[in-house]
């Protein structure tokens, strides 16, 4: 199944690149997004670009996907578990009320669910993770085709991993807050004489705080006996290298704008003598809409 998803994604990407090479003239695409019409409640029609820079407009994107997950949590097991990951992702973007049209407000929310098994197939992981991030990007338009942006996000995350094999300490919980550096590049092109785009966004955690028990410390000790010293850790790229890459292609299909995406979500930590990683690679499909407040 994963092979079919990868093959479909590569075919779609090849078609979009071929269409962009065949039609360099973007007469139907406005040079700057401020020229886009602002008198519509739903601007998902052919005359509008996938840009958040229209005043009073909010861009909303929903993506659903599946892929692979590699999970390690030495609090539960020294083995790395592999399995299937499912994701629902929502992304929003709009022009900020300040910044003279150069600043956009961005939000990204995701829910992961994974089912993984050990190399010996005698243990299973049930894993879930939620992330919510929001912040600002400063935007540049060096050419009519490109939009570049850089900024920062505040990200909150939480989740758990449950090991079906363990009788003592069968689960591990997670909770964290981090400041992230964020950047994106967006390329606009014509797809059969209609506006389309390719987009890449990278977010990386710079510093934050995270809950993690110490090695050998049980949840009974923490919450029943009150032995909670040292469970809150300061995080940085040295002990918690975490990054996310989201790439997508937005294509016009009749009156809709179909979105094909790939997400690489890498979360790692070494806190309190315990190691954890969650490496997720998912391929997604969904839609993008722009709503304009009249």
Regions found by a protein language model. Give the residues of each.
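Extracellular loop and loop/strand-boundary signature of outer-membrane beta-barrel proteins
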Residues: 73-81, 116-124, 166-173, 231-235, ...
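Outer-envelope beta-barrel architecture signal
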Residues: 56-62, 99-107, 144-152, 192-200, ...
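Residues that define the transmembrane beta-barrel architecture of outer-membrane proteins
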Residues: 60, 82-88, 124-132, 146, ...
């Amino acid at each position: 199944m994963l092979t079919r998803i990868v093959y479909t994604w590569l075919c779609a990407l090849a078609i979009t690149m071929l269409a962009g090479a065949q039609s360099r003239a973007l007469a139907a695409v406005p040079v700057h997004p401020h020229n886009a019409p602002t008198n519509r409640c739903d601007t998902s029609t052919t005359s509008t670009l996938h840009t958040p820079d229209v005043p009073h407009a909010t861009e909303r994107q929903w993506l659903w996907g599946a892929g692979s997950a590699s999970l390690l949590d030495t609090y539960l097991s020294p083995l790395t578990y592999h399995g299937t990951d499912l994701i629902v992702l929502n992304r929003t973007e709009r022009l900020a009320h300040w910044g003279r049209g150069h600043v956009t407000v961005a939000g990204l929310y995701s829910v992961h669910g994974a089912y993984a098994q050990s190399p010996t197939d005698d243990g299973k992981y049930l894993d879930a993770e939620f992330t919510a991030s929001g912040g600002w990007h400063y935007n540049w338009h060096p050419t009519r085709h490109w939009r570049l942006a850089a900024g920062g996000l505040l990200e909150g995350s939480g989740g758990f991993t449950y090991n079906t094999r363990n009788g003592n300490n069968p689960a591990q919980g997670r909770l964290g807050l981090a400041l992230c550096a964020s950047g994106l590049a967006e390329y606009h092109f014509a797809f059969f004489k209609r506006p389309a785009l390719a987009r890449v966004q990278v977010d990386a955690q710079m510093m934050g705080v995270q809950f993690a028990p110490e090695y050998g410390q049980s949840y009974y000790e923490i919450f029943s006996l009150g032995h909670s010293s040292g469970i809150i850790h300061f995080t940085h790229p040295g002990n918690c290298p975490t990054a996310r890459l989201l790439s997508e292609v937005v294509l016009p299909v009749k009156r809709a704008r179909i979105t094909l995406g790939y997400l690489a979500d890498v979360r790692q930590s070494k806190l309190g003598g315990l190691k954890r990683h969650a490496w997720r690679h998912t391929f997604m499909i969904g839609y993008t809409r722009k709503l304009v407040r009249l």
